[in-house]
């Protein structure tokens, strides 16, 4: 039986039950909100860990955007 299946009466016991129900709903909402956050955090940490497992040669590769490449493209156009 749900909290709202009967008319709400304002006795002390009912107020306590309503507070418990509200707290459970808030905790459930926080749980649902934490799922995308934890998935995103896992994705970021997983990609970082994958980058750490790459060979050392991959860490020391030159940048693909060096000035030499830019100068070569500029001279080819002219």
Curated annotation (Swiss-Prot):
Subcellular locations according to the entry: Cell membrane
Keyword DNA damage: no
Keywords assigned: Cell membrane, Membrane, Photosynthesis
Superkingdom of source: Bacteria
InterPro entries (alphabetical): Intrinsic_membrane_PufX
GO cellular component: plasma membrane
GO terms of biological process kind: photosynthesis
UniProt family annotation: Belongs to the PufX family.
Function: Associated with the reaction center - light-harvesting complex I. May play a critical role in facilitating the interaction between this complex and other components required for light-driven cyclic electron transfer.
UniProt name for this protein: Intrinsic membrane protein PufX
Organism for this UniProt entry: Rhodobacter capsulatus (Rhodopseudomonas capsulata)
Name of the gene: pufX
